Amino acid sequence: MVPTLTRRAVVGALTAALFPPVSRVQAQEVKWSSGTAKPRAIAPPGAIDCHFHTYDKRFPPVAGATLLPEDASPEDYRALQRRIGTSRGVIIQPSTYGTDNRLQIASRQALGPENFRVVAVVAEDVPDAELRQLNEQGVRGVRFNLGFPGVLTVASLKVLAPRLAELDWTCQINMRPKQIEDNADLLMSLPGKLVFDHLAQVPQPGGLESAPYKIIRGLLDRGKTWVKLSGAYVSSKSGPPDYADAGAVAAAYVKAAPERMVWGSDWPHPSEREQKPDDARLFDLLAEWAGGEAAFKKILVTNPADLYGFSPSGQ
């Protein structure tokens, strides 16, 4: 077994080679984001963005990858933080890289490991030793990106959820609406903490009357499920700038369980190939969905700090 110090040294060397020191210079424009204005809503101290990715062509995509974005670096992401006011974050392994989590782990080191966590992708038969190593490297969950071809399947949830619960990690789930309907009983039976990406992709039209929404509401009532108020554009039919149909779903989630909502920018918005959204507007929409300062702070600070193991104060 490789000593822990050696593993850390390897990660540190990889990070130093890939990314120069992150600049603190003010930026007006953000790569992979429309607009230049700051949001009207003011982020509370210690605000956490629970969903963003980095991409780098020096890391080969997995065979069959369907999303192949241009490079999006930690430096680029810092510009987004300066624009919207967040200071902490959770880096999500994209489907592009399969189970090769090196880039997201190195990005965490470049951004500052005390203020960032990682959600990884692993094989269904991942050894316990690898999970422990990933835990040391800041990983706090596994993503089941089931709407895209990948190493994990719906059946993998049943296999891995108990193991992740032992680590106090999250099962981060990205499912199509029909998958949620078809697997409602399985989802209800899973142990541990479930986090649904992108408003759980509640379909439009239909929204609050749809079966997937009602299933997610049932999971919220169970008490071990969180919803990520991210990617309104994934399911919206009404579209920008307000994504009113998806926004109605988001506001209903907040009203039902404000203590189990988190937010993510989804930068660099890999699914939006023609026109990138305005991240400042998306942040202002979150404030509208929250309906008040107390819920806004819960969503951005209190809830994600508890879920991913950050300091609750942001200090």
Report the location of each language-model feature:
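Active-site phosphate/pyrophosphate- and oxyanion-stabilizing loops and adjacent acidic/basic residues
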Residues: 78, 105-106, 184, 217, ...
